[in-house]
Amino acid sequence: MEETIGRGTWIDKLAHELIEREKALGRSTDMINVESGLGASGIPHMGSLGDAVRAYGVGLALGDMGHAFKLIAYSDDLDGLRKVPEGMPSSLEEHIARPVSAIPDPYGCHDSYGMHMSGLLLEGLDALNIEYDFRRARDTYRDGLLSEQIHGILSSSSKIGEKIAEMVGQEKFRSSLPYFAVCGQCGKMYTAEAVEYVADSRKVRYRCADAKVGGKQVAGCGHEGEADIGGAGGKLAWKVEFAARWQAFDVRFEAYGKDIMDSVRINDWVSDEILSNPHPHHARYEMFLDKGGKKISKSSGNVVTPQKWLRYGTPQSILLLMYKRITGARELGLEDVPALMDEYGDLQREYFAGGGRGGKAREAKNRGLFEYANLLVKQAGPRPHAAYRLLVELSRLFKEDRAERVTKKLVEYGVVDGPSPEIERLIGLAGNYADDMYAAERSDIELDEATKGALSELVELLGSAPGDGLQDAIYGIAKSHGVPPRDFFRALYRIILDTPSGPRIGPFIEDIGREKVAGMIRGRL
């Protein structure tokens, strides 16, 4: 029987492998730095968030093993803007090829466009209670924290260029330095071609010429100048920059997405062979895809952001999504919120009630998953919970005094004992989901003449004085018009819920309100 490592999750397995590797390398394990790179050029999405959340999870497992850890959240805000993300102001077009830290924030709330984008991701991490040490590329380069690594890399640029061509077939760095200078005259970086490294003065000579950036031709200004590698006048290319950071920040773990696998392979080689620094332990994860199977992109409009998700779901639902597994591509949309919310509810019930399906290993893994979804913060007991899908359906019915009326139904159903702040919070989230996701025009309903006649009679009945036996009355109306009661009930559910079935129709109409239902029916006649 295979021994359970830690809490039985992939997170624990990775942390265990990391420590074993560090011991084999003879390095101290008193403090382990894990890193996540934050893109600063596009709108941060759930995939961007997942990189940092997973790294933090590995850190938590390290802490569980008795090792101190720190998550370094590194914003690549010296990167240049290659294209304007969908939905962003077109005025950003004039800043194409400029470092995102040098572009004004179009919304005026941060010191730069890059910091605005990074701030959105940090806001998501804060909402999840993820602790991190935030660092900016602009400050890192400006303060010369990578200068020794840059010197070592540029001094070996010919060797690196040959290796890049050998490993991934990219010829570019055989003839140019793996360094992007920022033109001192026009402020653009991808037009400033680095042509020579002067090791004695530690400066990069460049000339600013026309270049293709983000699929478009961008004009250079013709300026020739020098960039000091000890400042923020340029940055290393991705193919080598990770290695510089890993050594400068003593990074021992970094996960990466499948899309940058080649860059990581090259950086591992640069770290090991050029900088003589053993590369970090890695974990490769698959990307989140949109519901059409396309990669979620920072610059396109198919982005599910942490902010959008948290309008409908709890932080625990996001953490569960990230910690369930690390392998396998997954399609992700806001329509997945209900399933994750209910899955967390199931884990909570199993955790405190005991039992569960799948044997001891599966039970241990599920317990561990619940604990990581709460960032290993011990839970005193189960929080009040109700099935999210039920909350959504009830929220669709009750807009006025929603929390009170939905809670009343939950008590009647025996789901909860009474009102509580937690249930009110869940109703608020489910209510947002109901209001936003079902706001589109409802589907058409085909009604024959007999059904229309029965519905008209029901409208008259609902407008009269309330009486007992509404369920039987509806049944009788259907029969009197020659409509099978089952078909009549289905038509009513379609009108009220836009679904083919629902709760017992008579009490259901009384719950919603006779006048309101009558109005719904009139709108379909």
Swiss-Prot record:
GO terms for cellular component: cytoplasm. It catalyses: tRNA(Lys) + L-lysine + ATP = L-lysyl-tRNA(Lys) + AMP + diphosphate. A motif ('HIGH' region) lies at residues 40-48. The keyword Iron-sulfur does not apply. Its main location: cytoplasm. It is found in: Cytoplasm. Transmembrane segments: none annotated. SUPFAM superfamilies: An anticodon-binding domain of class I aminoacyl-tRNA synthetases (SSF48163), Nucleotidylyl transferase (SSF52374). GO terms for molecular function: ATP binding; lysine-tRNA ligase activity; tRNA binding. Keywords: Aminoacyl-tRNA synthetase, ATP-binding, Cytoplasm, Ligase, Nucleotide-binding, Protein biosynthesis. ATP binds at K298. A motif ('KMSKS' region) lies at residues 295-299. It holds the Pfam family tRNA-synt_1f. GO terms for biological process: lysyl-tRNA aminoacylation. Its EC number is 6.1.1.6. The keyword Signal does not apply. InterPro entries: aa-tRNA-synth_I_codon-bd_sub2 (IPR020751), aa_tRNA-synth_I_cd-bd_sf (IPR008925), Lys-tRNA-ligase (IPR002904), Rossmann-like_a/b/a_fold (IPR014729). HAMAP family: Lys_tRNA_synth_class1. Belongs to the class-I aminoacyl-tRNA synthetase family. This is Lysine--tRNA ligase. It comes from Cenarchaeum symbiosum (strain A).
